[in-house]
Amino acid sequence: MSEREFLRFGDELDVKNCNTSRSFNGLLMAIGGIIGGTAGMLIALIIAGFMNFMSYWFSDKIVLSMYGAREIPYEEAPWLHQIVEELARRANMPKPKIYLVPMEQPNAFATGRGPGHAAVAVTRGILEILDQEELKGVLAHELAHIKNRDVLVATIAATIAGAIGFLANMAQWALFFGGLNRNEEEEGGGFAEMIGAILMIIIVPIIATIVQLAISRSREYFADETGAKICGCPVALARALKKIEEYVMQVPANVNPGTAHLFIENPLKGGGIMELLSTHPSTEKRIQRLCELARKMGQECI
């Protein structure tokens, strides 16, 4: 990919990020309208505004605290900080903070609202199974997400998914207490609203999945390519993805499904319907693309 193509694709991603965020907010308001009419839409609008505000300013703290991550001081792992510093220099971006997640499953993610306010988190497991070249590939992939501002959109998606779940709970309580604006004179309308609320409660998990899938798989492909160019070794990233996938299938992780799309490899991977609805492209396809890039760079693939 030429520099001009790289910049043009980056501009396209900025537009896509904006459109995706608007779509999430619109989806939330539509669900609020179905559940509670005008009042429901107003509540959904307030929730969306609050969630977006929280996502923008506190997304890194929310996600990191969710997984008990702690910041790694330079003195504890100078080699790791040096790797991130070098990669950030190559990517022409500020060095993000580095966090350790006390999780045995090998994985990593990035969070934050932009290059100047971001963090990269690695699990204990990934530090144990990858060599330094492979780890460079993983960290470069996460820096690519930060540079492309994928992290902000992904975090907004996670918070909107949570808000959708909140609205579903509202519908359940409304049904329980008969608070769906029914009265004796409008039994037909009240019945229709009740059926609509029941259907909404049933399909909310499906909608939450669609929200996650809206985080385009092309973002992962582009982050792989950009990360491989940053670290200079597509083969190392390909090896890392292969190792991580093998361990993810064997080592379970206590991960909130609403944040699964933040990780470099789907931490809930398990085949079947979950594989079909995965927020990530298949590892095999990602490796194939990295191998193609490696050959263009004169490297032998795995």
UniProtKB/Swiss-Prot annotation:
The keyword Kinase does not apply. It comes from Aquifex aeolicus (strain VF5). The chain crosses the membrane at residues 27-47, 151-171, 195-215. The keyword Disulfide bond does not apply. Its cofactor is Zn(2+). This is Protease HtpX homolog. Keywords: Cell inner membrane, Cell membrane, Hydrolase, Membrane, Metal-binding, Metalloprotease, Protease, Transmembrane, Transmembrane helix, Zinc. The active site is at E142. Its EC number is 3.4.24.-. Gene3D superfamilies: Metalloproteases ('zincins'), catalytic domain. It comes from the Bacteria. Belongs to the peptidase M48B family. It is a multi-pass membrane protein. HAMAP family: Pept_M48_protease_HtpX (MF_00188). Coiled coil: none annotated. The gene is htpX.
